[in-house]
């Protein structure tokens, strides 16, 4: 989730998706988001943009920050400590979508799957992360479609990126 930029660059350019995967091409008109709980919600990009909007300035650090110092060195972006940045994100809050889909507190965790793919251990796979239900139901989580006042760039997860402040 990072690119080579100075630490804490105010433009947020260093918060790009880069877990070693190629940046996928996405046609937003054909793309949709599925949220599965007791009910399944399928939302188009336009549907998401019609929902209530929220903004947040968030500093993020790539999970792979510092991996250039690992032995043996992994095949990936050779980050030292520069994979940190701050950006202004805009999108729709996650919690109402989870509630509409019937994802409740009886769930243990929520798995988020990106379109970016990579190879780990000779197995091709999509980038995935999970959050506990407690974390996922926080009010400050955003499904962001804008970054710093413009559309979310492809290298930052276009058309949609989960933003979890403090994670």
Model-derived regions: residue spans:
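Structured, non-membrane catalytic/scaffold regions adjacent to prosthetic-group chemistry
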Residues: 1-167
